[in-house]
A protein has these predicted regions:
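The two-metal-ion catalytic cores of nucleic-acid processing enzymes
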Residues: 1-260
Length: 260
């Protein structure tokens, strides 16, 4: 651990930026909110693709909450909640720096899940992401917490990003809203030569078949990364909403972990 950044060597800086943990070939991470586990998607040049699980200790940084009416400022209620949610409090070193003393001076951890950490604050009357609390509580997403705590880095071991198997897709729709439109084309392409355009007529059966085919292709190709232009905000929600409207059983779609 670097005690003073001013005295850090080139090797220490490199280790800090690139992650000191030696594990290689992690290309993606998913967090299971039900299980509290991290799912590591790995693409090893020798062993091939695999999914491994790992755990971490959820944490956040917290400042002075004495004026926040946290659990009505009742110490007994706070301690009871700490027991319920497995909370551990660590005081951080601030030295003689006045700015640090006025900042986030506590590391809050839980022996339970990320949800328990969030619930600890919400049940005490504080929304960790609320406008009034952003300066007092900082909770990172589970994936970021895992990478920081375990000192790991994505894509370590790859000289070129093109070595990672990627798939991109795009939906063509008749409207911006799935409630009054339909999918009439799905384009799929990966960086290893696969290309497919699924054309769909105006019959519901054709759209249903195309959606199932899309997920079957993903399962067959098994790309390490799936992406698209604004896909998380448009294509994926659109796809699942159309499946719902068409009466499809989305549990039949082959995913990373059907139990999550």
């Amino acid at each position: 651990m670097i005690e003073n950044l001013k005295d850090a060597t080139t090797e220490e800086i490199h280790e800090f930026l690139h992650g000191s943990d030696p594990e290689k070939h992690i290309v993606a991470l998913e967090y299971g909110y039900r299980t509290g586990k991290i799912y590591k998607i790995k693409e090893c040049p020798v062993k091939g693709k695999a999914i491994e699980t790992d755990t971490f200790t959820p944490f956040c940084w917290v400042g002075n909450l004495s004026k926040k009416n946290f659990y009505q400022n009742n110490k007994h209620k706070q301690k009871a909640a700490m027991t319920k949610y497995g909370i551990i409090v660590e005081k951080l070193e601030t030295g003689d720096d006045e700015r640090l003393k006025l900042g986030l001076t506590y590391l809050i951890k839980t022996t339970k899940s990320y949800r328990d950490l969030v619930s600890f604050f919400k049940q005490g009357g504080l929304n960790p992401w609320g406008e009034d609390n952003r300066g007092s509580i900082q909770i990172l997403p589970p994936i970021e917490q895992y990478l920081i705590q375990k000192r790991k880095r994505l894509f370590k071991g790859f000289e070129e990003y093109d070595d990672v198997h990627r798939l991109v897709f795009d939906l063509e729709t008749t409207s911006l809203a799935p409630e009054d439109g339909r999918i009439f084309m799905i384009g799929i392409k990966d960086n290893r030569g696969y290309e497919k355009v699924i054309e769909i007529d105006d019959k519901p059966e054709s759209e249903i078949e195309a959606i199932y085919q899309f997920f079957d292709i993903i399962d067959e190709i098994k790309p390490s990364i799936i992406g698209g232009y604004n896909s998380s905000n448009f294509d994926w929600p659109w796809l699942f909403k159309r499946a719902e409207i068409l009466g499809m059983n989305t549990k039949e779609f082959k995913t990373l972990n059907p139990n999550e």
